[in-house]
């Protein structure tokens, strides 16, 4: 699964210059409003013709301005899901789904309708009209319609932006299933750190029409200096963990990560199941000696590998915990009082572990103190 983009385009006074390559299952285009995310995704879709450059999906050239190649949008085999579901109001859910297949030649169809219905959990909705659906249900149907076009690439332009938190919690698990159970590469537009940290395998961060960072999610999400101001407090470490064991005596689950063991309340998951967790920099304290007499359960030893200025009186400290970097945001006064320096051995005291319990028996975001 690969997507390669190297394009330039000007829209009035706004210019987009984007170059990135991703082989991840779900690539997030991330940045604040006005950073060029939607313009870029529209060029990939064929809705905007770039002034220069090339776009390739799975080795297939869609755009190459030097070679005079521009594949029209209806021949790109790209599925698209927008902020609003854009379902046909006079059609039932079943008819909306079938519409996705009408313009795909029979020999190019690979999507099975029953499998898509099962994947998205929309079987009970088939006889309804869009007016009788919730926002989350409409988006699931829109995703199903896009999948039934048998696309080679799925573009999702802020599909959760118009939903409240409850509806987001409803639909996120289905996007995760789509990412994990299909072989369709996904490009996902968002300005939410929580969404990107949960869903993305790779991130392309945009600002003022340019790519300012790209790479694996766990690396890019640590660039607190590049996050939108309103999202900076959500940045930090993203860790892919696995369930090691359950401590039934205390009702806890122990997760294994590169940074060390992390204890959280009991999860309804089997040993070995994957869990992605997020540790925000603002939720990490630093100790120069292993602390005692604390309620915090998650204390990770490490070495300081980075110290950089933050906003106002804050500094951001990167701690290498057995190969995984955990970030802490503390004050400069605290840094000086603790005499923190590069190479110093410290303990990261994690006050809160955040993750989404989509597959853990709940389905709502969870923040675990300690």
Curated annotation (Swiss-Prot):
Belongs to the ABC transporter superfamily. Molybdate importer (TC 3.A.1.8) family. It is found in: Cell inner membrane. PANTHER family: ABC TRANSPORTER I FAMILY MEMBER 10. GO terms for cellular component: plasma membrane. The keyword RNA-binding does not apply. This is Molybdenum import ATP-binding protein ModC. Pfam families: ABC_tran (PF00005), TOBE (PF03459). The gene is modC. SUPFAM superfamilies: MOP-like, P-loop containing nucleoside triphosphate hydrolases. Residues 2-233 form the ABC transporter domain. ATP binds at residues 31-38. Keywords: ATP-binding, Cell inner membrane, Cell membrane, Membrane, Molybdenum, Nucleotide-binding, Translocase, Transport. GO terms for molecular function: ABC-type molybdate transporter activity; ATP binding; ATP hydrolysis activity. Residues 293-359 form the Mop domain. It is a peripheral membrane protein. Its main location: membrane. Its EC number is 7.3.2.5. It catalyses: molybdate(out) + ATP + H2O = molybdate(in) + ADP + phosphate + H(+).
